[in-house]
Amino acid sequence: MEARDILKRPVITEKSSEAMAEDKYTFDVDTRVNKTQVKMAVEEIFNVKVASVNIMNYKPKKKRMGRYQGYTNKRRKAIVTLKEGSIDLFN
């Protein structure tokens, strides 16, 4: 799996924006990847040094549309902490 396939999109919320001040960046990632693969992908794409990676899994939620019922997609979110002295990702 290539680095561009691992990171789907950055997560831009109020909480993740506040965490950027502490050099913590949040991404939606592929559900099949592990912390090491996320670390290598961020270092390759953005040319920064990663200190740590925390991953959260979100289960699919049950949703109804009239009489039909289904599930939302499951998600996996990674919070990447950069080492001191690294460049900002989004500047």
From Swiss-Prot:
GO CC aspect terms: cytosolic large ribosomal subunit
Subunit comment: Part of the 50S ribosomal subunit. Contacts protein L29, and trigger factor when it is bound to the ribosome.
Role this protein plays: One of the early assembly proteins it binds 23S rRNA. One of the proteins that surrounds the polypeptide exit tunnel on the outside of the ribosome. Forms the main docking site for trigger factor binding to the ribosome.
UniProt KW keywords: Ribonucleoprotein, Ribosomal protein, RNA-binding, rRNA-binding
PANTHER family: 60S RIBOSOMAL PROTEIN L23A
Family (UniProt): Belongs to the universal ribosomal protein uL23 family.
Name of the featured protein: Large ribosomal subunit protein uL23
GO biological process: translation
SUPFAM superfamilies named in the record: Ribosomal proteins S24e, L23 and L15e
Database matches in Gene3D superfamilies: 3.30.70.330
MF-aspect GO terms: rRNA binding; structural constituent of ribosome
